[in-house]
Amino acid sequence: MPISLNPSHSNTQTFKVAAVQAEPVWLDLQGGVEKTIRIINEAAAEGAKIIGFPEVFIPGYPWTPWANNFVDAQVVLKKYQANSMPLHSPEMDRIREAVKEADVNIVLGFSERDGSSLYIAQVTITSDGKIANHRRKIKPTHYEKTIFGDGSAQSIYNVVQTPYGRLGSLNCWEHIQPWLKTHFYSQYPQIFVGGWWPAFPPHTGGSPYIVSGEASSRMSQLVSMEGGLFGIVCCHVVSEAGARKMRMLGFPWFTFPGGGFSVIYGPDGAALTDPVDPGKEVVLYANISLDKIDDVKLVADIMGNYSRFDLFHTTVVNGKNWKPVAYGDPDEQAASKAQQAEIDNAGKGSIVPSKL
């Protein structure tokens, strides 16, 4: 289907975007709302039109169950639950009003409380103060599953129109979910906010490289290059006092203060901001214009000139299909099933029954 974007990739208007690197007000809903509003006003005063916040900035990212057994973590997690924010709440209304008064657009990461359950959520709030998009991380990562539920199917719709372009959102390791990303790119985002946890230098305390700040930043950089869009990468800072409150002290993967790796990427993957101290609270700014997207997509547009949808495409099946691959041609599908059956049965005739 032909696509007409407004504003288009020929638009040379320059505007400012902002990436937040800040320490949450740990386990404090009201304090977190106050700090979020302060940052919105600060960034608006600097001329930012789009502001990105980290993953679950309210009330902070809970590394706690990674660093403790569940019994020891529970006292923190109870407070975490109590200070998570419902979507429809006076606290969210205050943030929406602040966005409207500041005349900005934001993507905010927060721990959403729905009844007694928690979800890793993002809202895109446009300059009229309306929630243009609400989504939940589709699959919590590793120990996150002990706290947070899965996002619902509507969470794959994560791109909205703003006066400054089509604005998308991803949370943490959603950046390495291939099928989610394909659906994301199919919505033609021009700018996205990557909301991230606090992450630390590679191999700190024997940690796997994939959980490092460097790896996390590269995941967002790949989305910018792959999709040909601007990336606003936002993450936490953790002080020693914050680590003590969240029971993170003593776990070998962490160094305090630290956790930050915020950056803004261009659609070619180039960093538009200078590296910053991982332990420093800062709001990063970059002036961007959408015409730079065409410079990249002239070479490789994965939703256009650099695609083969006649060979590979993603089918959204509303949770009814568990298979990672399906063939449109019935003969190919039958051949695939026969091949899988052969694999499943391989070696069965050579198994020697036990004599025990």
From Swiss-Prot:
<dbReference type="InterPro" id="IPR036526">
    <property type="entry name" value="C-N_Hydrolase_sf"/>
</dbReference>
<feature type="region of interest" description="Disordered">
    <location>
        <begin position="331"/>
        <end position="356"/>
    </location>
</feature>
<dbReference type="Pfam" id="PF00795">
    <property type="entry name" value="CN_hydrolase"/>
</dbReference>
<keyword id="KW-0378">Hydrolase</keyword>
<feature type="active site" description="Proton acceptor">
    <location>
        <position position="55"/>
    </location>
</feature>
<comment type="similarity">
    <text>Belongs to the carbon-nitrogen hydrolase superfamily. Nitrilase family.</text>
</comment>
<dbReference type="GO" id="GO:0000257">
    <property type="term" value="F:nitrilase activity"/>
</dbReference>
<dbReference type="GO" id="GO:0030196">
    <property type="term" value="F:cyanide hydratase activity"/>
</dbReference>
<protein>
    <recommendedName>
        <fullName>Cyanide hydratase</fullName>
        <ecNumber>4.2.1.66</ecNumber>
    </recommendedName>
</protein>
<keyword id="KW-0456">Lyase</keyword>
<feature type="domain" description="CN hydrolase">
    <location>
        <begin position="15"/>
        <end position="290"/>
    </location>
</feature>
<dbReference type="InterPro" id="IPR044149">
    <property type="entry name" value="Nitrilases_CHs"/>
</dbReference>
<feature type="active site">
    <location>
        <position position="137"/>
    </location>
</feature>
<feature type="active site" description="Nucleophile">
    <location>
        <position position="172"/>
    </location>
</feature>
<dbReference type="InterPro" id="IPR003010">
    <property type="entry name" value="C-N_Hydrolase"/>
</dbReference>
<comment type="function">
    <text>Catalyzes the hydration of cyanide to formamide. Degradation of cyanide may be important for plant pathogenic fungi in infection of cyanogenic plants.</text>
</comment>
<dbReference type="InterPro" id="IPR000132">
    <property type="entry name" value="Nitrilase/CN_hydratase_CS"/>
</dbReference>
